[in-house]
């Protein structure tokens, strides 16, 4: 309504609904929340790490899956950062965590894991992931609550590699 002096008039002359839409009943979705899924992923990563430490062998299939998914998600984030015209996508700090480097390096990582050779990628990854988790609170971008446990999962996997190589070389 518009009030001018003593007169009151409506802002619009008349109201007409084009479509009378009712919200659809979506039904049951996925039974687990994203946070529950990422904690299950951390549990599986810890179990695989314990298994690797117990058997003294790298389970490279787990690396293939975990770092492959990280690299594929990184391809999507990288595409959005470089080719999207939306102003908020250009400064997406998730590119520090999810980038295509693991996908590109994956064949070398798997080869070195199968041969039992030391891989400096995991040491560098530990530094990058720890740095990301430390600067996360100071970045102006708001992250989903599942980003930190996901980074922790990747950190656990890389730390397990470094610890296992250290254990094998210092028998």
Model-derived features: where do they sit?
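Soluble extramembrane regions of membrane proteins in the secretory/endomembrane system
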Residues: 1-24
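Generic detector of multi-pass transmembrane helix bundles and their immediately adjacent loops
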Residues: 45-50, 71-171
């Amino acid at each position: 309504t518009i009030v001018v002096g003593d007169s009151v008039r409506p802002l619009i002359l008349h109201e007409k609904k084009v479509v009378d839409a009712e919200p659809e009943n979506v039904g049951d979705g996925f039974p687990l929340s994203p946070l529950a899924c990422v904690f299950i992923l951390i549990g599986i990563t810890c179990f695989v790490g314990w298994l690797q430490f117990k058997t003294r062998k790298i389970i490279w299939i787990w690396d293939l899956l975990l770092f492959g998914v990280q690299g594929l998600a990184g391809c999507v984030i990288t595409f959005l950062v470089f080719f999207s015209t939306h102003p908020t996508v250009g400064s997406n700090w998730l590119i520090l965590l999810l980038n295509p480097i693991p996908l590109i390096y994956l064949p070398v990582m798997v080869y070195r894991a199968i041969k039992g050779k030391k891989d400096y990628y995991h040491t560098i990854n530990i530094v990058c992931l720890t740095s990301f988790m430390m600067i996360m609170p100071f970045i102006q971008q708001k992250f989903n609550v599942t980003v930190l446990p996901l980074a922790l999962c990747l950190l656990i996997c890389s730390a397990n590699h470094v610890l296992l190589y250290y254990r094998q070389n210092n028998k």
